[in-house]
Every structure is written in C-alpha cells, then in structure tokens.
C-alpha cells in the first residue's frame, strides 16, 4: 500500500503532500523533513529505492522510500513492503507524464498555482493508497472531461451572481 506521496523542491519546500495514513501535523512535518534529508543528500547515480528498516524512528520497519528527481522537484512515494519498487517507479513516471500532458511541460509554478488540478490528477491514479489507473491517456481524458464540466458550470455561476446583484430588496 502507498502510505504517502510528496513532491518537494530542491530547497525542501513541499509542493504536494498526500498522506494515506493518519499522522498528526507534527509527525507529518517530521516525515517531510526526514524524507527531504534522505533524498536530497543522495547523488544522481544512487539507487532510487531506500529501505528504511530500523534506521528511522518515524517510519515503520517495512517502509520503503521510492523517489525520482526531475529538474527541481523530488517525487517521493512512501510504500510498505508489499509494493513493487519498479511498479512505483513506473507510477511516478506516469504521474509526471500525466502532469506534462495536462500542463504542457509541467514546472514547479504549475504545482503551486494549480494544486487543485494536480490533486485531481493524483486522485485519478491513487485513491486510499491503492493504484487505480496507470494509463496517462485515460488520466488526461478524465482531466479534460473535468475541465469541460468546470467551464460549463462557471458561466451559470457568474450569470447567477450578476442576476443576484441586479435584484435589490425594497426597503
């Protein structure tokens, strides 16, 4: 099972945080700090899989860290021992490809200004720590459908707001 998914920039600023297990706010902050320290000090040639084992007082013994470093961002998945490392690496690649399709060459600013859409894309792929979809074409198609629905709703909402402003109660 996937325990958490994080995107952290090179300076340690979290850009996306998704926990599939309940942790207190303090523990979440500890996890973010420890994950950044673990992955940021590794070289480009290092393996992208980390077995935590007994080396941490934050994570369970069976926790594995699987990450990829793209440009200025670390895509980090914390999983239990039942998950395949290679399938999670593929899932990270699928996530990045889906983001690239949706944002036409995704960058860190897209994650900052469109975090709701990033969460939507992630929720198309993973729900409750379980992988739902791994096909970027299907993920992008669902994203496009959602965008069309949002655009169809907005004229109604803005038109309703305009009508409400023109109606003034009699005093």
Swiss-Prot record:
InterPro entries: AP_complex_ssu (IPR016635), AP_mu_sigma_su (IPR022775), APS3 (IPR027155), Longin-like_dom_sf (IPR011012). Pfam families: Clat_adaptor_s (PF01217). GO terms for cellular component: AP-3 adaptor complex; endosome membrane; intracellular membrane-bounded organelle. The keyword Protein transport applies. One of its GO terms (biological process) is protein transport. The keyword 4Fe-4S does not apply. Keywords: Endosome, Membrane, Protein transport, Transport. It is found in: Endosome membrane. It comes from the Eukaryota. Adaptor protein complex 3 (AP-3) is a heterotetramer composed of two large adaptins (delta-type subunit and beta-type subunit), a medium adaptin (mu-type subunit) and a small adaptin (sigma-type subunit). Belongs to the adaptor complexes small subunit family. PANTHER family: ADAPTOR COMPLEXES SMALL SUBUNIT FAMILY. Part of the AP-3 complex, an adaptor-related complex which is essential for the compartmentalization of the endocytic pathway. This is AP-3 complex subunit sigma. It comes from Dictyostelium discoideum. The gene is ap3s1.
């Amino acid at each position: 099972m996937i325990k958490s998914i994080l995107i952290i920039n090179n300076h340690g600023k979290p850009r996306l945080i998704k926990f599939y297990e309940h942790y207190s706010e303090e523990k979440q902050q500890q996890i973010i700090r420890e994950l950044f320290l673990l992955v940021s000090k590794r070289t480009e040639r290092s393996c992208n899989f980390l077995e935590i084992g007994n080396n941490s007082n934050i994570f369970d013994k069976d926790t594995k860290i699987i990450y990829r470093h793209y440009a200025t961002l670390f895509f980090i998945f914390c999983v239990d021992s039942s998950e395949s490392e290679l399938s999670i690496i593929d899932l990270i690649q699928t996530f990045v490809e889906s983001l690239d399709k949706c944002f036409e060459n995704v960058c860190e600013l897209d994650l900052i200004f469109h975090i709701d859409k990033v969460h939507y894309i992630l929720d198309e792929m993973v729900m409750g720590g379980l992988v739902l979809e791994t096909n970027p074409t299907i993920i992008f198609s669902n994203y496009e459908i959602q965008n069309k629905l949002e655009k169809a709703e907005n004229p109604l909402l803005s038109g309703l707001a305009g009508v409400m402003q023109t109606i003034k109660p009699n005093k």
